[in-house]
Design a protein with these regions (language model features):
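A hydrophobic, helix-centered structural microdomain
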Residues: 1-66, 172, 177-206
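Positions in alpha-helical segments
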Residues: 15, 30, 43, 87-91, ...
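Short, glycine-rich, amphipathic interfacial segments at transmembrane boundaries or analogous
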Residues: 41-85, 143-161
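A short, structured surface patch at a secondary-structure boundary
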Residues: 63, 79-139, 179-182
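Short amphipathic alpha-helical interaction/hinge segments
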Residues: 68-71, 116, 191
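Acyl-group handling in specialized metabolite and lipid biosynthesis
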Residues: 164-167
């Protein structure tokens, strides 16, 4: 009952409450993003959502225009503290997680949920193994179980296992726990960036 009805109601309520804060953050960050390199304010990120459907995830742009797609050895997207692709304002937004705020619009549209597995790129879903694809049985989230219990400090495949755990145990109580732990994780700045070893990062092939 919660997964089919209650979760959507919670998403709409939280999305509407968050919307004014989203608009304020966009109003403050937009000129800083634009004047740093005269590029677009938003990055419309292609992602894979529930049931394997493609959707556009909205983000404030944190990287330089036409930045290459860097990947880890396991095929996941690189996200390091020394990422040369990030702009100065982008590094701050990424660390504070405010680049993700426009995703509340995705929540109101129904593409995403407030809590759920973080969405992957299409090329990443093609690397799923075993039960990994179960994460696509629910809507992706702005925050999620794997996002607050390890975040980017965990290897990608370990995060996938946590995503599958969430899908198999989703409940109102678990969502509340993840939601409030998100503030704790952001405040402590735990696991914001991945720590790759030499040679682990390469440019994705087209």
């Amino acid at each position: 009952m919660y997964l089919r009805f209650g979760k959507r109601v919670c998403d709409i309520v939280i999305g509407l409450i968050a919307l004014p804060f989203v608009l304020i953050i966009v109003a403050i960050c937009a000129p800083l993003i634009y004047f740093e390199d005269k590029g677009p304010i938003f990055y419309n990120a292609p992602r894979v959502g529930k049931d394997g459907r493609d959707f556009t995830m909205y983000k404030l742009r944190s990287m330089k225009v036409n930045a290459p797609d860097l990947v880890m050895e396991d095929g996941s997207t690189y996200n390091g503290a020394d990422d040369p692709r990030m702009t100065r304002i982008g590094a701050f937004m990424r660390k504070a997680s405010i680049d993700e705020m426009p995703q509340f619009i995705n929540v109101l549209k129904g593409d995403m949920s407030v809590v759920g597995p973080r969405p992957d790129l299409r090329r990443e879903t093609e690397l799923y193994e075993g039960d990994d694809g179960e994460k696509l049985l629910v809507k992706p989230g702005i925050t999620g179980y794997a996002a607050v219990y390890g975040r980017n400090s965990l290897p990608w495949r370990d995060r996938l296992k946590l995503d599958v755990y969430y899908v198999r145990h989703v409940s109102f109580a678990l969502d509340v726990k993840v939601f409030f732990r998100t503030f704790y994780v952001i405040f402590k700045q735990d696991g914001v960036y991945v720590e790759p070893e030499d040679g682990d990062v390469k440019e994705a092939s087209n």
